[in-house]
């Protein structure tokens, strides 16, 4: 995500490396590169110029503390400016009413229908809401079928009127149905078009006027850059929506839409889509996104994802097993599967400070597959008691998993080291754990 922008900004900060003071000359050199990085990210010239002018004003007015280098100060100023550009504080979706009506708008191909299902899943699983999805696209039967399939995947009812060609009537009837069936949120997926046109605008404006939604969200494909921003402006001028959803953000290396859409339409980005899976949806936090752009990671989101996957009761059981030295490959496999559910290795790595520099070639998304294959080739007794894994058993496991003995031995070694480290963490041996980690690094 935004790899190109991150690399260019990092290079621009190197101009200040070794400099004792911030001066007009070195600030000008740095900001020339920052402006170029923003323009390459598909940020408009006016916004790039405004941002760099703000940074210059703040940088030249700062006093350098002896403990902070000019480069560090510049990173902090750029971070704050990027966060402010993307909206500052995050904005919550308004679902206080009962039922809360959420209207979804956007161009065809923006990921609107997929987002509708993701939002339903999010509100059901993380907010405890009873959700009704509404198929309001009367022009594309495939869109109705898609929403029905996705609704089934996430366990959410989908309201349809197959014979009707009136989206206003469908939306009105769906809200009545939701009230009769005690639904707490109604999500209305509307028709998309290949381009902005008057018929589309009139239609969705009529739906909005009839059902009076508590939240209107505009969905855009972040990979379309300034086109996404221009489309959002055209919609907002007519529809006056409440927030933006950026889809396909995981494939966006530039970041122009995320950086500029707020300043153009004066509406917050509320959600971002990060993949095809139904749980690949995140609340948008401008400050956390600025952290990730500048290679500072996003530990808060990483911890939140971990908390969603790791059950407190299971963690307590695991702690007891570790204390008794009973951690086995069944437990190890369970931990691996929980980590997998948190997201792709690439996305998780981007949340760890400094890990954004790791190239795609160094990230093996299939690494867990071979681990699962090796553990799957063990007998129940071997998984329960790893101490019995002698040479002949390891050769059999390698053959059964389609790997080689080196990979099997490596996994067993990793298992043993993980077990020791986790045991030290649970028994309070922090000092011993740090010594062990330093020894592992020296190998």
Spans of model-derived segments:
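Residue-level recognition of specific faces of alpha-helices
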Residues: 1, 15-18, 37, 47, ...
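Long amphipathic alpha-helical segments used for membrane anchoring, targeting, substrate engagement
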Residues: 2-19, 288-443
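Primarily NTPase-proximal linker/entry elements flanking Walker-type ATP/GTP-binding cores
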Residues: 8-136, 143-164, 171-190
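Residue-level signature of catalytic and energy-coupling elements of molecular machines
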Residues: 16, 42-44, 78, 107, ...
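Amphipathic alpha-helical interaction segments
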Residues: 29, 33, 50, 54, ...
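Short, small-residue-enriched loops and turns at beta-alpha junctions
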Residues: 110, 139-141, 165-167, 192-196, ...
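Conserved phosphate-handling catalytic cores of large alpha/beta enzymes
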Residues: 171-175, 179, 183, 195, ...
């Amino acid at each position: 995500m935004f790899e190109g922008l991150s690399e260019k900004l990092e290079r621009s900060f190197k101009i200040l490396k070794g400099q004792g003071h911030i001066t007009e000359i070195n600030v000008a050199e740095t900001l020339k590169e920052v402006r170029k990085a923003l323009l390459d990210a598909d940020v408009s010239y006016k916004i790039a110029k405004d941002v760099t002018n703000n940074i210059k004003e703040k940088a030249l007015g700062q006093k350098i503390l002896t403990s902070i280098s000019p480069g560090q100060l510049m990173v902090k100023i750029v971070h704050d400016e990027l966060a402010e550009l993307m909206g500052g504080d995050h904005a919550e979706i308004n679902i206080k009413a009962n039922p809360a009506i959420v209207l979804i708008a956007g161009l065809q191909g923006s990921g609107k229908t997929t987002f509708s299902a993701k939002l339903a899943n999010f509100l059901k699983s993380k907010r405890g809401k009873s959700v009704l999805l509404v198929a309001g696209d009367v022009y594309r039967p495939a869109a109705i079928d898609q929403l029905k399939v996705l609704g089934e995947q996430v366990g959410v009812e989908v309201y349809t009127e197959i014979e009707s060609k009136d989206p206003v009537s469908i939306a009105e009837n769906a809200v009545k149905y939701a009230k009769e069936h005690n639904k707490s949120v109604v999500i209305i997926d509307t028709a998309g078009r290949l381009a902005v046109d008057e018929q589309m605008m009139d239609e969705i404006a009529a739906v909005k006027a009839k059902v009076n939604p508590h939240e209107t969200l505009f969905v855009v494909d972040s990979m379309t850059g300034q086109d996404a921003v221009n489309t959002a402006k055209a919609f907002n001028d007519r529809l006056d929506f409440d927030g933006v959803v950026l889809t396909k953000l995981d494939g966006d290396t530039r970041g122009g839409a995320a950086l500029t859409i707020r300043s153009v339409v004066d509406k917050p980005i509320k959600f971002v889509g990060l993949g095809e899976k139904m749980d690949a949806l995140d609340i948008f936090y401008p400050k956390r996104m600025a952290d990730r752009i500048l290679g500072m990671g996003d530990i808060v989101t990483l911890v939140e994802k971990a908390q969603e996957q790791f059950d407190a009761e299971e963690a307590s059981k695991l702690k007891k097993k570790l204390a008794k030295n009973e951690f086995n490959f069944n437990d190890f496999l369970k931990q691996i599967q929980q980590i997998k559910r948190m997201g792709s290795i690439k996305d998780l790595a981007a949340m760890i400070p400094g890990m954004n520099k790791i190239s795609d070639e160094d990230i093996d998304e299939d690494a867990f597959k071979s681990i699962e294959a090796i553990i799957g080739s063990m007998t129940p007794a071997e998984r329960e008691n790893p101490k019995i894994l002698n040479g002949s058993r390891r050769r059999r496991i390698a053959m059964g998993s389609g790997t080689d003995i080196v990979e099997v031995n490596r996994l067993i070694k990793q298992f043993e080291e993980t077990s020791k480290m986790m045991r030290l963490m649970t028994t309070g041996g922090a000092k011993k754990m740090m010594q062990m980690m330093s020894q592992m690094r020296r190998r």
